[in-house]
């Protein structure tokens, strides 16, 4: 593997289930098989991860898909062009509300998205303060919350102000009544519910399309200078993805997630059983049938930015920006 342009690689991640393939590739030695020595760096927030990737402290990162078109548009005030060769997860987030708020609004666990939207919007119109948090402005979670509110009132959805919280801080934030609800990926909805703080009232796949949520992101300049290194990284992570899809026993994977403090609650086939199997299903179906980035996903993200922020762009510009988000060298398959 001496032909690799770089052997020491810094990979940033946020503690969520959908960084699992990166962690598993390291644990199983798949990076080492490719001649790579990887340093896994846990970041405090999406903003810090974005900045450290843009300024070269990280070579590669577990990244929000919407960060890429946002950077291309200059919305994040970055001078870096971000690209992805690989999807890490597709749309699989949830909206949770405080349990006492659910009781006050008569929201039951089996409620549908339209009903939960109607009851929250009605509370907002009655000036019953309902503060909602997203993980970052440029994320499917942000768009999911807006589209959820828009099921009832598009104007309110467009003008609604959201708070921002890193995924690992969601449980603490709702427990301390910093906000009343949030949209985030797992395992943070499950943890907040198990600890008695919130209930899940909506699922993102029932609100927005099955677009890429997290991707493996690099700066375009770094990718152009390190094509063989990037190919090796993708090969290792794809091997981990394939392994996770096929494994019948995820006990080692579970232990790894506990070690990384991603799973911080007791959950097994004997305790919180439905949550246990839900997490296993998410791990096995993280990226759907294909982990290849799709032009239509980034086109949808750009359309959302245009819809909610009135960003002007022609159809040709939208296509060009969407294409620029995808690393063009074909990823190696396992």
Regions flagged by a language model, labelled:
Residues 3-155, 180-187, 197-203, 209-210:
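Short, glycine-/small- and polar/acidic-enriched structural segments
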Residues 155-160, 224-229:
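Inter-helical turn/loop segments and adjacent helix faces that build the functional surface
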Residues 95-96, 215-218, 222-223:
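Short glycine- and hydrophobic/aromatic-rich loop-to-beta-strand nucleating segment
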